[in-house]
Amino acid sequence: MNATDIERCRKRIIQYIWDPEPKNDEEPGSPIWCLGTRYPPQCVEETADESRNPDHGQQQNTNTSAPGWPEAFLLDFESKIWMTYRSNFPPIPKDAGQEGSLSLTLGVRLRSQLIDAQGFTSDTGWGCMIRSGQSLLANSMAILLLGRDWRRGERLEEEGKLLSLFADSPHAPFSIHSFVKHGADFCGKHPGEWFGPTATARCIQGLAARYDQSNLQVYIADDNSDVHQDKFMSVSRDEKGTVRPTLILLGLRLGIDRITAVYWNGLKAVLQLPQSVGIAGGRPSASHYFVAVQGSHFFYLDPHNTRPALRYSESGTYTEDEVNTYHTRRLRRLNIQDMDPSMLIGFLIRDEDDWEDWKARIMSLEGKPIITILSESDAASWKGRREALDEVEAFDDLDVAL
């Protein structure tokens, strides 16, 4: 067992033994921003339904209220689609001789040899970045399909059809099986290995292109934090020149071991933009899906909960209990000082007006930028760039495992 395995086990033990739900007492006077929607501090109310289980599929303390949080924020938070580890799904074939690979953690190697001898039937211990990426993609598609103001419990039939695209089956276009296959074919990632932000972004791009009905283009910034307008337009425009819904993905490293303080305000601003669809990654050795920020604290959905696999349903027909496993009211937060600097940031551009609005907002942000929009992609546009963004790096999946 190496140092990484030991540290991961230590964190998991601490979380299981002592993981109280946060109270709104750290920065109660600060507004909360959830994917571009602002919840002012003066709207703080008691939780409306204290009988609701905040973390469906898990046993919780009988006191399930969320002390001091705005009810409107809680309704928004629990409406986000939450992807987690799953178990007992159809086997994902292993590569020959992979059991002894050092790229697999000790726990994954043991499970591979003792339980999943014929193939991986659970992604517990290795699929957290994939699940975080699925969360980012699913919520982007939910905004397109259901609207940003959609709330849990509404339009159940359409939500079921969306969830079916992410079911734990080789038949689902955005399943764990599809991510792993694309990762093996095009990203040099093998079953049971961690995916970094870059591989996850490439999988999202490839799978979305393969599934025509997604109505979603994907643009990946392939050099640092620069978004080249001409390249973006070549991806987003159709043959008539109309800008189609496009997901912008940026894999960044905002420091070495921690996020450099000069980028704190820029990262906080990401979740305040109306085009934001969240941040995947952002915690050492464990990926989360960050959707909200209050002051210096980021709220996230944690994929490190193993639930039964979701069966594939072509019609999208699921029971209430099955749908409930994709939502939680249970808040978790992390101070920006404790976040890992490697992450995948997403923005959803719905049309040309949205693109112009996003550009204007990015260019007007104060402080050191973490994103730059270039009007041309020639060499002249790079003048002065290294001085302006000397610590923002494109993320290389080989640097760190999430």
From Swiss-Prot:
Pfam families: Peptidase_C54. Keywords: Autophagy, Cytoplasm, Hydrolase, Nucleus, Protease, Protein transport, Thiol protease, Transport. One of its GO terms (molecular function) is protein-phosphatidylethanolamide deconjugating activity. It is an enzyme of class 3 (hydrolase). The keyword Cytoplasm applies. The active site is at residues 128, 302, 304. SUPFAM superfamilies: Cysteine proteinases. Residues 56-66 have a biased composition (Polar residues). It catalyses: [protein]-C-terminal L-amino acid-glycyl-phosphatidylethanolamide + H2O = [protein]-C-terminal L-amino acid-glycine + a 1,2-diacyl-sn-glycero-3-phosphoethanolamine. GO terms for cellular component: cytoplasm; cytosol; mitochondrion; nucleus; phagophore assembly site. The keyword GTP-binding does not apply. Its EC number is 3.4.22.-. It is found in: Cytoplasm; Nucleus; Preautophagosomal structure. One of its GO terms (biological process) is mitophagy. Residues 46-68 are annotated as: Disordered. Belongs to the peptidase C54 family. Cysteine protease that plays a key role in cytoplasm to vacuole transport (Cvt) and autophagy by mediating both proteolytic activation and delipidation of ATG8. Required for selective autophagic degradation of the nucleus (nucleophagy) as well as for mitophagy which contributes to regulate mitochondrial quantity and quality by eliminating the mitochondria to a basal level to fulfill cellular energy requirements and preventing excess ROS production. The protease activity is required for proteolytic activation of ATG8: cleaves the C-terminal amino acid of ATG8 to reveal a C-terminal glycine. This is Cysteine protease atg4. The gene is atg4.
